[in-house]
C-alpha cells in the first residue's frame, strides 16, 4: 500500500465533494491512522472513544453522522458492532490513483 497515493487520491476526491466538511476529514485521518497501525490491512477494529479522541470530535451524534456519511459516500465500509466488548469494523476503500507527473 502506497499511503502517499492513497492520501493524494483522498484529497483529490474530497476537493470535488460538497458533502465533506472538516469534521469528516478529521475523522477520516483518524481512521487512516488506525489503518496505518494495522499495517494497512482491512478490516480495522475501532473503538468509538479512541477514534473520537484522535479526531477531536466531542459529540457522539456528530461522530456517528460523519462515520455514516463516509460510508454512504464510499470512502469507507463501516460495520457497526452493538457489542461493547467487540469494536466496530472499518474497511478502508482504496482511493489511490496513479499520480500524473
Where are these regions (language model features)?
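Winged helix-turn-helix DNA-binding recognition segment
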Residues: 35-97
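Short recognition helix of helix-turn-helix/winged-helix DNA-binding domains
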Residues: 1-54, 72, 101
Amino acid at each position: 500500500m502506497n499511503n502517499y497515493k492513497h492520501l493524494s487520491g483522498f484529497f483529490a476526491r474530497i476537493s470535488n465533494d460538497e458533502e465533506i466538511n472538516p469534521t469528516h476529514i478529521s475523522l477520516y485521518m483518524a481512521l487512516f491512522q488506525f489503518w496505518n497501525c494495522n499495517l494497512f490491512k482491512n478490516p480495522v477494529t475501532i473503538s468509538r472513544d479512541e477514534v473520537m479522541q484522535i479526531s477531536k470530535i466531542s459529540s457522539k451524534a456528530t461522530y456517528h453522522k460523519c462515520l455514516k456519511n463516509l460510508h454512504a459516500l464510499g470512502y469507507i465500509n463501516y460495520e457497526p458492532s452493538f457489542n461493547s466488548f467487540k469494536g466496530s469494523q472499518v474497511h478502508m476503500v482504496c482511493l489511490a490513483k496513479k499520480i500524473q507527473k
